[in-house]
């Protein structure tokens, strides 16, 4: 959509089937999602959109390769593409720089013990246009390839275009035993090792949140073992 809205670009990619576009961009994966590095790209009027896309893909590939080469032993992703996928989840879960490596630690810790990631952004992505804007228990139970409350692994593709900060965090998680986190309502998160501690945090930061704040945020599930994250 970003490229289509750039009216100064010569539109060449819009009419291409996605598989053909992936080949043209040198993307071996089965999806374009996640491969365009978020950045500012300079071009002249009349430039082909495909040329700018290639710049974005080349940058993302370079960033991913750089991160993969410096990954820590604590990283539980098995391939660069899995790292890109996890990075996209981190990107959607937090915009706070100080929380990225902590969020990464939660997901890497869960992957290491075969625990479902149970992350809402993947559910929302899987629902697509069916998502109402307020996540519900039914949404969490609706099976899609991206519902990480249902599947015990990473989703099949990224769900967003991650920045360098999220890519680096995905392969260099903080050294913690955290398995849960919950939004505190101010952009930061509270992290917990146990379900009991997490449920207390949910009561503190979600259930006791003023109604005006609750309306401003997507509804979060009640703290049960199946839906806690």
For each predicted feature, which ranges?
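Small-residue-rich helix-loop
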Residues: 97-150
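Residues in well-ordered beta-strands of folded domains
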Residues: 42-44, 124-126, 147, 181-183
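Conserved catalytic or metal-liganding residues and their short signature motifs at active sites
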Residues: 1-116, 160-165, 169-177, 184-229
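Short glycine/proline-rich, acidic loop/turn segments that cap or connect secondary-structure elements
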Residues: 135-144, 167-179
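Substrate-binding clefts and substrate-entry loops adjacent to catalytic sites
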Residues: 46, 63-75, 135-140, 147-155
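Short, local alpha-helical segments
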Residues: 145-154, 163-164, 183
């Amino acid at each position: 959509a970003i490229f289509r809205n750039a009216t100064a670009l010569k539109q060449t990619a819009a009419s291409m089937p996605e598989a053909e576009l992936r080949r043209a961009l040198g993307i071996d994966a089965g999806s374009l999602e996640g491969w365009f590095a978020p950045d500012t790209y300079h071009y002249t009027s009349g430039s082909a959109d495909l040329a700018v896309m290639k710049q974005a893909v080349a940058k993302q590939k370079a960033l991913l390769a750089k991160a993969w080469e410096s990954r820590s032993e604590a990283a539980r992703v098995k391939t660069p593409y899995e790292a890109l996928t996890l990075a996209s989840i981190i990107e959607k879960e937090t915009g706070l720089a100080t929380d990225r490596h902590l969020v990464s630690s939660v997901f890497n810790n869960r992957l290491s013990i075969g625990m479902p990631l149970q992350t809402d952004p993947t559910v929302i992505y899987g629902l697509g246009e069916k998502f109402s804007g307020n996540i519900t228990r039914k949404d969490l139970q609706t099976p899609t390839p991206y519902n990480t409350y249902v599947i015990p692994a990473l989703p099949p593709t990224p769900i967003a275009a991650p920045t360098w900060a999220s890519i680096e965090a995905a392969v260099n998680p903080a050294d913690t035993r955290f398995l849960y986190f919950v939004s505190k309502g101010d952009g930061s998160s509270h992290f917990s090792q146990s379900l009991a501690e997490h449920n207390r945090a949910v009561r503190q930061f979600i259930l006791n949140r003023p109604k005006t704040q609750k309306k401003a945020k997507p509804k979060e599930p009640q703290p049960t073992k199946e839906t806690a994250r």
